[in-house]
Amino acid sequence: MVAETTAYRTQNAKMGCYQSGPTYRKEPRNSAISRCFWAFNYIYACIKDCVLIDPCMGSGHILVYAFDVLMDIYRNQGYSDRDAARLILENNLYGLEIDERAYHLAYFALMMKARSYNRRILSKDTKVNVFEIRESSGKLKPEYDQYLGNYKDLVQYLINEFQEAKELGSIVNLSCTEEQLDELEKHIKHLKANALDVDLIAQTEIDEIYDLLMPLIRQARLLVQKYDVVITNPGIL
């Protein structure tokens, strides 16, 4: 056991959480990931705000290791394994991958790791923030314009930027903001929710818009948001 005998106080301005020492914890795993997360444990009184992304995650080895490190920290802060497993998936770990098979392996590995701490995790509607990067189809159909309104330019921008996403992967550099993506997502979901109130042709077109844009919006959000830790092992670069 390591005693942190120097009293400290950290505040997260966003969450308004405070913590003061001394505290006691097990010696963390001896790796760069461990040291980084334990440092953020002191910077962020609420570990839920510490976010890591592997932008070239492959089959998820780094994310799975980071999961165990984060579990140590959550336990140190008094969380149960069941709650910590869900919070790690939903709040802390993000990943992108261009290969579909590797993405499925990463998703499976993370869910199995989470299940080792929470046996009910598979029966819950848990949000997992790992995605396969998808390419766009190229151009918008003219008939989509009536549904997109003021969002047409943003949609066309995303489609243009992701035309070669399978080649470029996470190095795609987007100039849009999270706020713009949030507004677009709300608009698309609103269209989907009200699709039953329109004729069959319109329903089909709205479904096509939803299926085309939602994956692009999700991966765009991961590319534009900020992270505390970015770590990867891109062997092909």
Feature map (PLM): residue ranges:
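SAM-dependent methyltransferase catalytic region
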Residues: M1-L237
